[in-house]
Amino acid sequence: MNNPIGPYRTLDLSPGRRIWVNTLELSWPAHSIYGLLEVDVTVARQRLDELEAQTGEDLSFTAFVAVCVARAVAEHKEVQAYLQGRGRLILFEDVNIGLMIEHQAGEKRALMGHVIAGANHKTFRQINDEIRAVQRAPAPANRGMPGWFRSLMLAPWPLSRLFMALLRWNGRRDPTSFVGMGGTVALTSVGLFGGGHSGWALTPTPQSLGLAVGLCASAAMTGVSQA
């Protein structure tokens, strides 16, 4: 017997949301391992605040995280290896970090994909300036996505499923085609969606390695001596 469920509404997803729903589907099926870390960034925040006071610049904390990730991955490049077929791994020498950058579009803020190429060869200042330049530049068409990729992600179901299966197959056949678009490592954060709260961030990613940054929060420290 069907019970009454009460009134409900049906809403159409915007094109942007449809694209991201299908893009996240590209990470399936993936054999993922998740790890939760808590890192003390007190000194880093203090140093950035000091530099901002000296220069008057708005420095990017994301740039600091990107530098740290790039240097760590450069020491263990196997974590950004990609399977080619079923019997070969491709190891990339450069750490190319794919991240989403908040872009001001009129009165709205939109997320746009960007890849910091060769991040392991760049300084904090270089990555910071690259991120700020992307934020200041006029928003590119399709939020930086190739036109063909956007069209595939907006295809009606079940065509979208077929296209995603073909993209996954091509990525396994030639991982360089995917890495050229999304980077070898993914970096994302809760950002503007989680202000005022603390917690963890978990997100699916098509990349072999992804870092999702939660939120900075004050916490009592025990067993720490001050000189």
Model feature map: region roles:
Residues M1-A227:
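C-terminal catalytic/motor cores of large multi-domain enzyme assemblies
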